[in-house]
A protein has these predicted regions:
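Alpha-helical segment that forms one wall of the substrate-binding/catalytic cleft
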Residues: 51, 55-107, 117-124
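Short N-proximal segments of mature Sec-exported proteins
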Residues: 29, 37-55
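Short, well-structured alpha-helical interface segments that form or flank functional binding sites
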Residues: 20, 41-44, 71
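Sec-dependent N-terminal signal peptides
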Residues: 3-13
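Structural recognition of the beta-strand scaffold that forms the well-ordered cores
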Residues: 24, 46-48, 98-99
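Short N-terminal segments immediately surrounding and downstream of signal-peptide cleavage
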Residues: 17-35
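Secretory-pathway/luminal and periplasmic proteins that interact with or process carbohydrate-rich
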Residues: 30-36, 103-114
Length: 124
């Protein structure tokens, strides 16, 4: 019984932490506007998801579905699980932020995501 209670607490803490990360991500990307559009990059929704990112997540449907914040979160989680599963499991928000901003090749030029990570970190 103690084990189940401990597991529940750990799972609750992890869920709260990922929610905190997504709150910071939304604030930095769109000022928490689920209808935001970056016309230059055609990045949509609260997390400013580009078409290639959406397609790469493999959740299916249309890119425009990311205007729904719940779907946008699902897209991000699928993308994170695909490219940085250990970071997602460990709540390594620095790695997840850099992946979100720099794409799956972000490690080739880590410094390109430095300022982005600082913005996310400030909002955590």
């Amino acid at each position: 019984m103690k084990y189940l209670f401990s597991l529940f607490i750990v799972c609750s803490i992890n869920a709260a932490n990922i929610d905190t990360f997504f709150a910071a991500l939304g604030k930095v990307e769109s000022s928490n506007n689920p209808r935001a559009i970056n016309k230059k990059e055609y990045a949509l929704g609260i997390y400013q998801i580009r078409a290639a990112y959406f397609k790469d997540s493999k959740i299916g449907g249309k890119h425009e579905s990311v205007y729904d914040a719940a779907i946008a979160k699902k897209v991000c989680l699928a993308y994170f699980a695909k490219y940085e599963p250990q970071a997602l499991k460990n709540n390594d928000f620095e790695t997840l932020a850099r992946l979100h901003n720099g794409g799956c090749g972000w490690r080739k030029n880590k410094s390109a995501t430095d300022s982005y990570w600082k913005k996310i970190k400030k909002n955590l």
